[in-house]
Amino acid sequence: MEIGNCAEDIVKIQCKINHSNEIDNQVTSAIERLTNTGIRVLNQTVLLKGVNDHAATLAALSERLFDCAVTPYYLHLLDPVQGASHFDITSDHASQIYRELQNMLPGFLLPKLVREIPGKLSKTIIPTDV
């Protein structure tokens, strides 16, 4: 195997953009500088009540990210942290939003719906019963 030809050799950075309104010229310029050096940029979005809890909003975000050469990678349920419960969405509601999103986007623009469970080594995929 040649060095530099496998996925493990690609430098990856994960950003956290929750709404397409966050992507301005400064952000696109920074992403472009990263991708021009061969860095792959992935995005993790947190599903937030009142911010991005509609499939159309999330679809617009995925499309905008893709336009900037960013892969929409994870759609997180909110971690239970003090002072943020007003942003929380139930797993059932998140699954409903996700099913709508699946009907709006091609697979390569569809992030994985996940949650972090304390003590688990990796993210847990949320079933959507599709």
Regions found by a protein language model. Give the residues of each.
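C-terminal accessory regions of radical SAM enzymes
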Residues: 95-130
